[in-house]
Amino acid sequence: MKSERIPVKSFSADNGFIGKMQKLVREEVLPYQYNILNDAIPGIEKSHAIENIRLAAEKLRGKDVKPDEFYGMVFQDSDVAKWIEAAAYALAAGEDPELEKAVDETIQLYGASQHEDGYVDSYFTVKCPDKMWTNICDAHELYCAGHMMEAAVAYYEVTGKRELLDIMSKSADCIYEQFMKKNTRAYPGHPEVELALMRLWRATGNEKYKELAKHFVDVRGQAPNYFVEEKKNRGWNVWDGTEELNTDYTQSTLPVREQKDAVGHAVRAVYLYTGMADVAKETQDETLLAACRNLWESITKRRMYITGGIGSTFMGEAFTVDYDLPNDTVYAETCASIGLMFFAKKMLENEHRGEYADVMERAFYNTVLAGMQLDGKRFFYVNPLEVVPGISGKAVTHRAALPTRPQWYACACCPPNVARMVSSFGSYAYSENDDTFFIDLYAGGTVKTEKGITLTCETDFPHGGTAKYTIKGEAETTVAIRIPAWSEKSLLTVNGEAVDLNAVTKDGYAYITRAWKDGDTLALTMDMTPHVVYASAKIAADSGKVCVQRGALVYCAEEVDNGKVLPLYVKAGAEPKALDFEPETLGGIVPVEIAGCAQQDIDTLYSTKAPKFVEKTIRLIPYYTWANRGENQMRVWLPVK
């Protein structure tokens, strides 16, 4: 059963959890990031992203701009694109003249950096215009274009303004000429433009953009490998160029329909799979969809962390092999979990099965939210499940897994990505087709459907387990609400009367078909009992350990609550207990306690004497809130004794 996500403007958040997160992004995160992109905050990692675009515009107007005036990564433009997209979604919540003015000025500047033929990329315009389109593998021209296409579609949908949409349509036309008529064997080094072209096609109706997206999917990985040949012939490199080309990293080892295992760079992988799933949906390509299902199984059944993190190593920011899920040398990039949400949503649009929304929820409420500090001013790129200050971020094997969030990064892909995901949450929470309105995630606020009814959701999720929807308007239609797999005992009522879930539930959704009337209610009560979770015996890193999950939230132990975390053991057979909601703690949480003990340390490195243990109640907090109280030890998985 196929579906479409709702437009971002169709959802308006209330002052619940999601509403507060969106308010934080709107009032704090976006202005902060805009200042960083303009290099207006001293003492932190320089961005220069908007200045690069200004330099490109000046060069096109005839100013003598030196190549070394460009600063930053080859994909620096994409930081600006993601910020514009996040700002667009924020504007859907209400007017903000100052924010809209900042976006409009940035768009005007970006338009001034576009070449006559539609090409637009500040790195090549400023630094090496003679090398445009000569390094498709590494140079990120298509990646940057894709992100700006997404921004253009978002800004047009929210504001009705076409300037950026026209700029990126011209850019897409340029890309079409280059890759459909000239270099027809090439495909993006970093997938992104595929999913973006599909969005641009929906916004403009231009069939060329869907055709190009499908082309990029179809030619990827065909023999002989394009990237191998390109590297032999191009004569220059973005990076040092000495390493052998890793086709797993570039998602080009096999044609996409032959891929079965998620490999290589995790963000590239899930961005590619998102584009594949979208193309499969819109072209009714069952072979391509079958490949997407195989890749989904590979990730979620064998290569995903309990937190919805993906990518097990900093070596290539990549997937490794099945069940290799180390907790301390993990990568689990924030962008990768955002990309996993993209992929999950597209699979959900192909076939409405609860497992896709379950993973989307797991990724969002754990890894994605952990990627941003509670004040919105610091960010994680990497999301470890175990941290020991002095080792984490210090030892060469642990250098990527930091114990605290930096203010910014030289490679700052994650901060604006979190902002756009939080701001667009409504379009992930709901979807619909001609017959059914789907509630995929629980988000407090009001959502307008195309069925003639409006739903207002009151929920205490994710810390509470109730979600009540009040209907406004009248229509005979179906509302399908997801029953989460983690809820062992769920209660669904319509106008206060219990529904037999066994009779109405299919693939994780309860389907309620009726003549809905003004004032009708649909209420879901979920089981929020905290549970001990055991890992598969195939995961070496978690052998003999357990973690705790309550609802969608994975919990962790932090040193600030428990003293040193490394000596802690959970008592065998202990049951976790949820405490009362603490509104003043970490923005408002429900802590969990579990019985355990702490191993007393010894004076030597090793000893033949058995250690002593003292009983201890272990306090746990939601994983997304960790590292908000200074540098300290943290663990998700705790050994059992």
Where are these predicted regions, by residue range?
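Low-complexity, Ser/Thr/Pro/Gly-enriched N-terminal "stalk/linker" regions
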Residues: 1-79, 104-124, 162
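Solvent-exposed loop and edge beta-strand segments that line ligand/cofactor-binding
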Residues: 2-3, 58-80, 96, 131-144, ...
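C-terminal beta-rich recognition modules with glycine/proline-rich loops and embedded aromatic residues
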Residues: 10, 213, 292, 358-366, ...
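Hydrophobic core segments within long, regular secondary-structure runs in both alpha-
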Residues: 15, 22, 34, 84, ...
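Well-ordered alpha-helical scaffold segments within catalytic/enzyme domains
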Residues: 18, 84-97, 146-161, 194-206, ...
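A conserved hydrophobic secondary-structure block that centers on an alpha-helix together
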Residues: 127-203
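Catalytic-core region of carbohydrate-active enzymes that cleave or remodel glycosidic bonds
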Residues: 281-302, 325-377, 388
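Solvent-exposed beta-strand/loop surfaces of large extracellular or lumenal domains
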Residues: 487-513, 532-538
